[in-house]
Swiss-Prot record:
It catalyses: 3-dehydro-L-erythronate + ATP = 3-dehydro-4-O-phospho-L-erythronate + ADP + H(+); 3-dehydro-D-erythronate + ATP = 3-dehydro-4-O-phospho-D-erythronate + ADP + H(+). This is 3-oxo-tetronate kinase. Keywords: ATP-binding, Carbohydrate metabolism, Kinase, Nucleotide-binding, Transferase. Pfam families: NBD_C, SBD_N. InterPro entries: 4-carb_acid_sugar_kinase_N, 4-carb_acid_sugar_kinase_N_sf, NBD_C, NBD_C_sf, OtnK.
Length: 428
């Protein structure tokens, strides 16, 4: 295959929508023209891109369903001609003892072959590092970072070898930081020894971007790689080294999109709470009350009326709340029902906003982003320049043009909403 061929080289499967854009952002920064599809396309298509990211909504669904969706995505990507496959999950390893990281990794490894893969959610640029198999968020262990209070995937153990081993019958091992520090050749030797010992999946330490580049080089021959978006840093260079990927300076170009903008927030993370507070201090905002929505009050109509009264000025419509407030709603409605209600409400609001002429959406929260893009009928996205680490601007390429910034809950600076609006306006 030559560098000018249009068939994609890297096929990626992400377990949520913002995670998919996070990964696509990383690939674009590394010079790969990247297209993100929303779900598995219904039919084969000729996509002119170096990498394709299939965005699923499989992180918290039953494990068997997550496996089925992931395998369907794999088969579709394989049919497009992808040479290597990547299973992307959150940099905080969001999962439970039932999955879904372990079951999906096992199924994809069986399908792709090779008998071995790594698991590395590290993203040092965003403070996620792995040392001796333990995941840190900033300076604290994962289970002390606030993730222990996550409503759907509470992370109460920072030892990823233990966490993953509880999810899989495959033997889980570790590639230590000191091996990685010695370079790709030593990592490949470690992989060979782990395979000889019966290990199928190895957690990989990573303290810096250099470690991720080393791991990427060491994984060049693996049919399947798994991890957070950070590990994708080193994968494009493998294709360049093999003269399969051309050098590009326009991988992040997007069309300009006119129209008004709105911010929608559903995440209850610390970062999103801070971003909501910063916006509310100076800008118009409307709070969604899940309990009012559950009582049948016209919350969607009220939110749309609020937005209409302020257009063309951007407004924030949010369900973001403190952990105690979230817990109270969950106790009243049930954990799953509460989350689904918030997603359904914000999705309906997004649909209504589009009818009002809104063409640019900033969305905070992985589950919320998934619900919103589905409500807007988005099928695929072209990935543009980074707004904040892990979050790019995007534009739809298969519907009436829309600009989207889809943010994982914990990502972004305090002023992210303003920065995202400027980026979607073409000013950033």
């Amino acid at each position: 295959m030559t560098a000018s061929a249009s068939r994609p080289l890297l096929g990626c499967i992400a377990d949520d929508f913002t995670g998919a854009t996070d990964l696509a952002n990383m690939l674009v920064k590394s010079g790969m023209r990247t297209v993100q599809t929303i779900g598995v396309p219904a039919e084969s298509a000729s996509i002119d891109a170096d990498a394709i990211v299939v965005a699923l909504k499989s992180r918290t669904i039953p494990a068997a369903d997550a496996v089925a969706q992931s395998l369907a995505a794999y088969e579709w990507l394989r049919a497009q001609g992808c040479r290597q496959f990547f299973f992307k999950y959150c940099s905080t390893f969001d999962s439970t003892d039932a999955g879904n990281i372990g079951p999906v990794a096992d199924a994809l490894l069986d399908a792709a072959g090779g008998g071995f893969t790594i698991a590395c959610p590290a993203f040092p640029e965003n403070g996620r590092t792995i040392y001796r198999g333990h995941l840190f968020v900033g300076d604290v262990l994962l289970n002390e970072s606030g993730m222990e209070n996550h409503p759907l995937t509470p992370m109460k153990d920072a030892n990823l070898v233990r966490v993953l081993q509880r999810q899989t019958s495959s033997k889980v091992g570790l590639i230590r930081y000191d091996t990685i520090a010695r370079g790709a050749a030593d990592v490949r030797a470690c992989i060979a020894q782990l395979r000889a010992d019966g290990v199928r999946i190895a957690i990989a330490d990573a303290l810096s971007d250099r470690d991720l580049y080393v791991l990427g080089e060491a994984c060049a021959a693996l049919p399947l790689v798994t991890g957070g978006s950070g590990i994708a840093l080193g994968l494009p260079e493998n294709f360049r080294r093999a003269a399969e990927l051309a050098a590009r300076d326009n991988a992040a170009s997007l069309p300009r999109i006119d129209g008004t903008a709105t911010v929608l927030a559903g995440s209850a993370s610390k970062a999103t709470n801070a971003q909501v507070a910063a916006w509310r201090a100076t800008r118009p905002s409307f709070r969604i009350d899940p309990l009012a929505a559950a009582r049948g009050e016209p919350v969607v109509d009220q939110a749309l009326a609020f937005a209409r009264s302020h257009l063309p000025e951007p407004v924030l419509i949010y369900a973001t709340a403190t952990p105690d407030e979230v817990k109270a709603v969950q106790q009243a409605l049930g954990v799953e029902a509460a989350g689904e209600l918030v997603e359904r409400t914000l999705a309906a609001i997004a649909h209504g906003l589009r009818a009002l002429g809104v063409r640019k959406f900033v969305v905070a929260g992985g589950e919320t982003s998934g619900a919103v893009v589905q409500a807007l009928g988005v099928k695929s996205l072209q990935i543009g320049a980074q707004i904040d680490p892990g979050v790019p601007a995007t534009a739809t390429i298969d519907t009436e043009p829309l600009g989207l910034a889809l943010k994982s809950g914990n990502f972004g600076a305090v002023d992210f909403f303003d920065k995202a609006l400027r980026a979607l306006d073409g000013a950033a």
